[in-house]
């Protein structure tokens, strides 16, 4: 699923503008006082999301249930490389191959295809596209902070 995605919920069908909507399975829910950590497996990729306990309860999130990792393109950062970085606090590091580069007037869109076939797209300033070597065919890492990854359910 990509961009303007139709989703069904108790509130009815809605469409969202988030560029990245990845279907997976919840592998763990860590309960906290105010926030919790939800782990979701999307293809071969393990992702984590820090969301409020209220959201965990409202969505009735449980281990083993299907869910969506929702990431706005503006929340995706990029780095050069073919291995996750070990000196970075962001938990979600998705290694892939650059498959699309679309420069705009000041910033552009870059898409990576992951080993499992999932695609993640992010926004990046044009000068950084060149500086990071984000060219079709090159390896890169899409980085998303756990606080920037939303969870959705049907």
Listing of model-derived features with the role each one plays in the protein:
Residues 2-23, 28, 46, 53-108, ...:
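Glycine/charge-rich catalytic "coupling/switch" loops of P-loop NTPases
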Residues 42-44, 115-117:
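Glycine-centered tight beta-turn/hairpin loop motif at sheet-sheet or coil-to-beta transitions
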């Amino acid at each position: 699923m990509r961009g303007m995605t139709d989703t069904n919920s108790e509130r009815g069908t809605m469409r969202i503008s988030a560029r990245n909507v990845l279907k997976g399975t919840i592998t763990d829910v860590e309960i906290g006082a105010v926030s919790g950590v939800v782990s979701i497996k999307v293809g071969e990729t393990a992702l984590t999301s820090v969301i409020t306990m209220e959201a965990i309860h409202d969505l009735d999130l449980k281990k083993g249930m299907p869910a969506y990792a929702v990431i706005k393109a503006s929340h995706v950062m990029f780095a050069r490389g073919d291995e996750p970085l070990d000196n970075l606090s962001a938990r979600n590091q998705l290694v892939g191959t650059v498959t699309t580069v679309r420069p705009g007037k000041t910033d552009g869109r870059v898409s990576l295809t992951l080993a499992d076939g999932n695609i993640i797209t992010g926004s990046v300033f044009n000068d950084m596209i060149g500086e990071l070597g984000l060219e079709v065919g090159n390896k890169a890492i899409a980085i998303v902070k756990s606080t920037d990854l939303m969870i959705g359910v049907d």
